[in-house]
Amino acid sequence: MQLPFPVAQDPDQHSLEKGRLLFAGDTEFVKGVVAMSGLPDPDRLEVCFAGRSNVGKSSLINALTGRKGLARASNTPGRTQEINFFTAGESHYLVDLPGYGYANAPVPVVEKWQRLLKQYLSGRQTLRRAFVLIDARHGVKKVDEEILSLLDSAAVTFQVVLTKADKVKEKEREKVLDQVRTALSKHPAAFPELVITSSEKGWGIPTLRSIITDLT
């Protein structure tokens, strides 16, 4: 039976406030990591963000934290090959994984990134959820399927976040939602709820904050 994968509902006032308070605290860049030996101590809960280059990952992290320049997008897709750690309040790490789907990156660079990603996803006990960002204009592409399968094999629960929802009309968005739901039905690690966001308009940002805050 195919799961319905409903869109996340607006949180209640209590959850909204919890989310607001978490992201109202200090949010700082901690470090960029290129090897497992460089990971910060696992003394906080972690959520990570994955997505194709140019899917709007940096914009989403900046919108969540209310810090415009916190996460910076590289001018060249796939240029940044680091796992970037940011604090959220006193209790969480936000982890920005390198963008994938970059056709021009050298093969050794891609292979090194893939090895590091597999090691991180499989070996980080404090990782509570991966948020996989999908462009609301395009849906799940083949390169997204690769990361979703990797999350399945690492047994890391992931939740799809649709980005740039303000760039597509509602009728077209519904078609994309159907395509995403069909794609996710094949992935056992998929959390059965979608989040629709627009960093530019602020859509879905309080909802995503609340989801992150409620993870334990």
Swiss-Prot record:
Gene Ontology molecular function terms on file: GTP binding; metal ion binding
Domain EngB-type G: 43-216
Key words, A-Z: Cell cycle, Cell division, GTP-binding, Magnesium, Metal-binding, Nucleotide-binding, Septation
GO cellular component terms listed in the entry, alphabetical order: cytosol
Cofactor: Mg(2+)
Keyword Chloroplast belongs to the record: no
Positions bound to GTP: 51-58, 78-82, 96-99, 163-166, 197-199
Transmembrane segments: none
Pfam family of the protein (one): MMR_HSR1
Binding site for Mg(2+): S58, T80
GO BP, sorted A to Z: division septum assembly
InterPro entries: G_ENGB_dom, GTP-bd, GTP-bd_ribosome_bio_YsxC, P-loop_NTPase
Keyword Endoplasmic reticulum: no
Protein family membership: Belongs to the TRAFAC class TrmE-Era-EngA-EngB-Septin-like GTPase superfamily. EngB GTPase family.
Annotated function: Necessary for normal cell division and for the maintenance of normal septation.
Protein name: Probable GTP-binding protein EngB
Organism: Roseobacter denitrificans (strain ATCC 33942 / OCh 114)
